[in-house]
Amino acid sequence: MLTKQDLQQIESLGISEAMVEHQMEQHRKGFPYLKLQAAASIDNGGIMAPTVKERDAFLAEWERYQAEGRKVVKFVPASGAASRMFKDLFAFLDAPYDEPMSAFEKEFFDNTRQFAFRKLLCKSCKADTQSSVCDLKEAGRYKEIVKHLLGEEGLNYGNLPKGLLLFHNYEDEPRTPLEEHLVEAALYAASNGEANVHFTVSHDHLQLFKDKVAEKVEKYEKAYNTRLHVSFSEQKPSTDTLAVNPDNTPFRNEDGSLLFRPGGHGALIQNLNDVEGDVVFIKNIDNVVPDNLKGDTVTNKKLLGGILVHLQKRTFAYLSVLDEDGYSRKQLDEMVYFLEKELCCKREGVSELDDNALVEYLRKKLNRPIRVCGMVKNVGEPGGGPFLTYNEDGTVSLQILESSQIDSNNAEYVKAFKEGTHFNPVDLVCGIRDYRGNAFHLPDFVDHNTGFISSKSKNGKQLKALELPGLWNGAMSDWNTVFVEVPLSTFNPVKTVNDLLRPEHQ
């Protein structure tokens, strides 16, 4: 089925023929739904809710860890284009009317003075039309304002990445999300006066990000007395996936070549694997707030970091005991209790295993990457949720699931997903080294059966696209996972331009 030209194309992308065959098989078979035990909650022990005393202890733990000079990295997926933020404004440009009609359009134009980009927008409008934004509104020339915001003749926001848009107003100058993440790194992810920030970006925007960092980094280093090491990576072509026709034959471009598409954020497990660090914080590019509201974010990030360090210490100590061979059955039982109670990983019949089998089981389960994930109370926002799920080896563990991973024909599962008490704001702290200080090879811990297939089109032709297991979903399926309740104030994503008018972004 694959031609000589196909094989050359595959090789040039760094993809093996076996991987392409595997992807075609996944298209044919589809992906199994996950088997759920329950939505994770505080009541069933799936989500931690630390007491004030415990919080203080974990915060102190994190500050001690920072003082030890460990390498902490802030990892920010930032390849997302801003075009979706402006979907309603693009629709307004194409609308048969010239003045704002919808509630969204009216809210935008009524509040143009509130946006952090207002001065740049006004400057662009004046340079081209000799009229300010206010003048253009009074003259009913609303679409010209939008063109200057979104188009190349103006700010070009319709084609820029989210990370480079002006989000927040300050007395000296407005800030982009990129800058807010640099500040966050200095506030909770620094060690010995140095902080590391890694952005994953698209190839087309890489230079723009580098230019912005070069322009701004010194300002924030001085303001926070912290040396900022900023690095970038792109999604690897070798993680692209083959698109197929509805009949599962390879979809071909007009020139006859195979169509490969980016495999979604799950591909970033390869980028994360390349990061050199002891602990990695992960948060999306658009979930930032101005300085006056950063307090909750900083405190809760430190809290998650402290919980991670606390759990790592105990895990590493147990693994060292197993290496010495002088352990007792009582110690093994204590490790099982820790694994089940603290790391929420359970399997029936473990107590019946003999010592050798139990040690093998404990080694396998304890010696894994660990992540501590913040979870916020469910207020109906779209996104994944925390669940207790059954794994192929018979264990039950914590997973972050998307709706696409749940059988929509199973009423009990759908109810559990809809009625879950918490949801995933993408707020993770990850331990990516083992108890001997070696980096884990993260692709070894991916569940390749947790991707999904979506329907897309190209040039008017339908196709099936293969999404890799999501970064915080199947790509981290075989990690030790702990969920911790964090306040809703730490979750402030910007999905539309009008979200910037919310109090938390003003």
Name each model feature, range by range.
Residues 2-42, 353, 359-366, 371-373, ...:
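Long, compositionally biased intrinsically disordered regions
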Residues 131-140, 153, 157, 286, ...:
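Conserved catalytic alpha/beta cores of large enzymes that bind or transform nucleotide phosphates
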Residues 182-186, 410-413, 468:
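Short amphipathic beta-strand starts and helix->beta connectors
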